[in-house]
Amino acid sequence: MKAEILCVGTELLLGDIVNTNAQYISKELANIGIEVYHHSVIGDNENRLLKELERAFNYCDLVITTGGLGPTKDDLTKESVAKFFQEDLVLHEKSLKQIEKRLLCFNKSMTESNRKQAYFPKNCEILENPNGTAPGFIIEKDNKIAIILPGPPYEMQPMFENKVIPYLEKLTNSTIKSKVLRITGIGESDVADLISDILERQTNPTVAPYAKQGETTLRITAKANSEEKAISLIVPIEKKIRQILGDNIYSSGETLLEEVVANILVKRNLTIATAESCTGGLLAGKLINFPGISSVFLEGAITYSNESKINRLNVKKETLEKYTAVSKEVALEMAEGIAKSAGTNIGISTTGVAGPGGGTYDKPIGLIYIGLYINGKTFVKELNYSGNRQFIRNITVTRALDFLRRNLK
């Protein structure tokens, strides 16, 4: 079965609202073996909606819409779908009573605008909406299926999970399962080169790399007639990829790098403190996102000036004068200084030139040093990046977390 997701709402086109519905529905459809061929976003305009429906059904069996089911005049999805399927809209008394009951919960009375929400194509299956006043519906005709859902995610998602998925599962006999591997320390092109044999020979499962800031994700996707069979197809490919990429894979699924690092620290009861210059607290902020980190994260210092590095971290004035603040020597003294000051097993530091100003020939914008102190041992890493200030700061935090992860292995 081929599907298109059609999200309706002028507010989406204007960028006032982020379209999370398409992402959610795509993932859910993939899990039950339905392939999504196209995403569309369209404003609240009946003629355009009709044209989009006609275009979509030229190559799809299934079109799922979200939005345009509200009580206002510009909510036209229901009317457009009814016209496309040549169906009259009729009042559904049960829905009318449910809408009225819902409105009473908010001390509101039924209006003609709300009454409009209780009209549906004559031949359709109505999907109750316990979270709002806009029921959805399913209409089938001439081998075409349209599933019409409300726009707000808190209304759409429960309806999709409880009503739409059971309906669709009866129509398909295949399952698609995916496994996501998260990779850092090497770029997308390096990943593609290392697993080129797998990428060139892929059929089922498929393997697709995706570049993100500071990391690459690999999605392994298998299609089979059962979940167990799909998983069994993924396992040998995943094993081979792990053998090739090794420690560059830091997690799978939704687990983020900071969560991996925080878990290691908590499980091994390793206390940590951070000393940041160019990242200005971003590194500490990432770590403290993790619940339970308070048992091991003792302190974070932002030491932006040379004076604060000397006074707060005990960085030697001579080191700063000889090597400058952007140097491996200062990064190491910062890491050791914060660890000893805070009394922690680990100290980690960042110093560099994030830009847009401050760069020199010897110390260009994007030159970064990460210092690391672990129970008396010191490590340092030099990085060179190009990009804007925010990118350089964010990538530095990612590399610092990964540097710590690898040295704790």
From Swiss-Prot:
Encoding gene (name): cinA
Family: Belongs to the CinA family.
PANTHER family attached to this UniProt entry: NICOTINAMIDE-NUCLEOTIDE AMIDOHYDROLASE PNCC (PTHR13939), NMN AMIDOHYDROLASE-LIKE PROTEIN YFAY (PTHR13939:SF0)
Organism: Clostridium botulinum (strain Kyoto / Type A2)
CDD domains cross-referenced by the UniProt entry: cinA
Protein name according to UniProt: Putative competence-damage inducible protein
Pfam family, one: MoCF_biosynth
